[in-house]
Amino acid sequence: QSLMSIQKSIIKLSHIPVQISNQSNCPYIDNKIETRAFVNLSEHPETHDQLAETGFRRVENWAYKPICSDCNECIPLRVICKSFKPNQNQKRCYSQKLIRNILPCQSNKQHYDLFKKYQKQRHKNGLMSKMSWANYSNMINLTPINSMIFEYKCLKGNILGVMLIDIQRDGLSAVYSFYDTTDKKLSIGKYMIIDTINFVKDNKLNYLYLGYFIKENHKMNYKNQFHPYEIYINGKWSKN
């Protein structure tokens, strides 16, 4: 996928400077090299939704998209929320009674403690496992668009999960989530996705953007479990 193809996919944004990163080790697939196209959203926040609709993702003040020359494994995926049909496993998962609180994007120590615990349990050797409080705060607080936090608690009041969410004109985007993995039977990560799908549906929006589906990465290939969904390939969204 070339820069030219990226520029064609956002032809209406031709006045926006699309920058290209240096090559680096791919964070998702071993022995792969990654290159990204990115846009500074702090200078052009109005472009975010159009970029998201062409497969870009947001991190802090930047929108980015992989444009690797020899790999197309990062496939943008969004759930068609109004038609979502949970399977039996998902129905059982969602039968739990968790409390959802909608919060502004402000970092706090309780969430950071859960984040660190999650990284230690699920991504022990990942780049984010050593994230400092300052960097975590940037991830949560730095957003040039409308964003929010979904916080999930059990009935006893313990925080079980947190999801950072961007608000788009056609739905929501799950930017990043983390949760308590101590009791695997709870499937908090799955619960948060189902609940956010239902939130999108209840608010008469269309999609929940889940980011990149990567078949070769078991930590990224769960996203096609939520049907129906669309994937972005060759410059268009196709139902799968």
Predicted regions span which residues?
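Acyl-donor-binding surface of acyltransferase catalytic domains
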Residues: 2-3, 15, 20-27, 35-108
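A structural signal for short, well-ordered beta-strand segments and their strand-loop junctions
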Residues: 59, 151, 207-211
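Active-site/acyl-donor-binding loops of N-acyltransferases
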Residues: 65-66, 75-82, 207-240
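Conserved acetyl-CoA-binding loop-helix of GNAT-fold acetyltransferases
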Residues: 185-197
